[in-house]
Swiss-Prot record:
Belongs to the baculoviridae p39 family. It is found in: Virion. One of its GO terms (molecular function) is structural molecule activity. Coiled coil: none annotated. Transmembrane segments: none annotated. It comes from the Viruses. This is Major capsid protein. Keywords: Capsid protein, Late protein, Virion. Expressed late in infection. GO terms for cellular component: viral capsid.
Amino acid sequence: MALVSPGVSSRRSTNHCIFGAIEPFDSCVTYRSPCSSDASVDDGWFICDYHLKLRFKMSKMVLPIYDEDDNQYKRTIARHLVGHKERGVKRILVPTRANYMTVFNLPGMMLAEQLIFHLIYDNRLEVNRICASLKNNENFIDNTYSVVESVYSATRNILSLTDPQAYCSRVANDDVRFFDANVVDNNYQAGNGDTVFNNMPGFLRNLIRRAVAPETLQIDSEDLRLRNCNTCVINNTGLVATVTNTELYNPVRSSDIIKTRPNRLQIRNVLKFEGDTRALERTLGRYEEYPMYVPLFLGYQLVNLQNDILRANNFLPAPFGVPQAVNNLEAQAPAAPAPAAPAPAPAAPVV
């Protein structure tokens, strides 16, 4: 049985970033995607930290959760790179299909990047528009076609891994997540934010699951309150780094700024401390520092147990026994088209 769709490469990828195959469609321009070193690591994000910072204004982190024996259950989380003075669309981290072209300023990107974003959002109209414009080039068959095929094939490979309907899909599906739920009669009822989340493409749903940690984590019957308030929301515009009333102080460091246009003048108003701080450093330098940035926390997560082993890797299928809250969520989620001939999922080893 062929597990690879026509037009998709079956070779094992060494770059797990969805932007890793970016090449200019102009054969006279030499450019390779400047992915960070984590692109070679299959960590389940399917985007490297460089492009996560550049396009989605987030940075990868790990949230360690300790038990009484100092063992760690590590889950992924991201901190957002939006300053507390930013307003409006600048606070949107992951936009929806309705506004992604405006939020990402797609017309300012090269055609290869535009094509990848349109593939992520499954905007076939824009994909066909780009293909039609490329076909008008007299060198399309000789030079451009092979580049377009390479970009398209590599992108489809990544998207197939995050498609819940794909055979042997690797999206996170062994847990229950609510981002905007209300508790009614001891049951979680999905809100508007969960509807927006469920309407997003598979790649973005996986990205949000990786980046946003729950305020409350339930492992079997154990409730862990990680935070008592959210640091982001999901609304009709997408995943937004905002809180009620005053925004959280979030200084953006110079190392977090991706300088794509070094010759462009930029003016930033920043807070700076001056004076002799060495005395304080000598006195307090021995203690552990509290990091002054804003990680993303929102909603509730239920992690199931299998064979009494907590799965740090969430690629395995859920066993059974979903709480009643899940039925409420599925009832409000749009129905997905049923596959023509569903194949049984192969047994996966417990990690």
